[in-house]
Amino acid sequence: MAELATVARPYAEALFRVAKAGNLGAWSELVSEMGQIAAVPDMKAVADDPKLSKADVAGIFLSALKSPVSHEAKELVGLLVANKRLTLLPEIAAQFHVLRNASEGAADVEITSAFPLEGAPLTELVATLERKFGKKLQAHVSVDPSLIGGVRVQIGDEVLDTSVRARLTQMQSALTAA
């Protein structure tokens, strides 16, 4: 996994520089879509098919995109196909997203709750987390009933676990240590 990140980083950084010079929002959507399409098993099979020419693989990939494709994006796809690195696009997209967030002072936050969390409670939680971390946060919410109650929040490498399960685990550790 670290190797993929290392190989994808220069592509993501170059792509981000191009995107900053143009329309960052449109590029962000396009790069996300490219990453999603490249992750599809059928597209991986097309990329690895020795019977298809590089131009055919690039053409098939580009035809699967719904977003408008610029000349630079076509060149990127051609370069990745020529170097047999089309399958790097999901990692390139992930790193591009991290670069965009960093430039905008934003971050993704993974919120896991024991019960569905939406509306006003979610808005309040995100606002509190934004004040705590000093960043604009994009929340991704999931439900995990095994938490029993409370929430588990992950922003980058930092984890805040206020779930009942975490508290029970702490209590168990304290009781068995005594």
Swiss-Prot record:
Pfam families: OSCP. It comes from the Bacteria. GO terms for cellular component: plasma membrane; proton-transporting ATP synthase complex. One of its GO terms (molecular function) is proton-transporting ATP synthase activity, rotational mechanism. The keyword Membrane applies. It is a peripheral membrane protein. Keywords: ATP synthesis, Cell inner membrane, Cell membrane, CF(1), Hydrogen ion transport, Ion transport, Membrane, Transport. The keyword Cell membrane applies. F-type ATPases have 2 components, F(1) - the catalytic core - and F(0) - the membrane proton channel. F(1) has five subunits: alpha(3), beta(3), gamma(1), delta(1), epsilon(1). F(0) has three main subunits: a(1), b(2) and c(10-14). The alpha and beta chains form an alternating ring which encloses part of the gamma chain. F(1) is attached to F(0) by a central stalk formed by the gamma and epsilon chains, while a peripheral stalk is formed by the delta and b chains. F(1)F(0) ATP synthase produces ATP from ADP in the presence of a proton or sodium gradient. F-type ATPases consist of two structural domains, F(1) containing the extramembraneous catalytic core and F(0) containing the membrane proton channel, linked together by a central stalk and a peripheral stalk. During catalysis, ATP synthesis in the catalytic domain of F(1) is coupled via a rotary mechanism of the central stalk subunits to proton translocation. This protein is part of the stalk that links CF(0) to CF(1). It either transmits conformational changes from CF(0) to CF(1) or is implicated in proton conduction. HAMAP family: ATP_synth_delta_bact. Belongs to the ATPase delta chain family. This is ATP synthase subunit delta. It comes from Ralstonia pickettii (strain 12J). The gene is atpH.
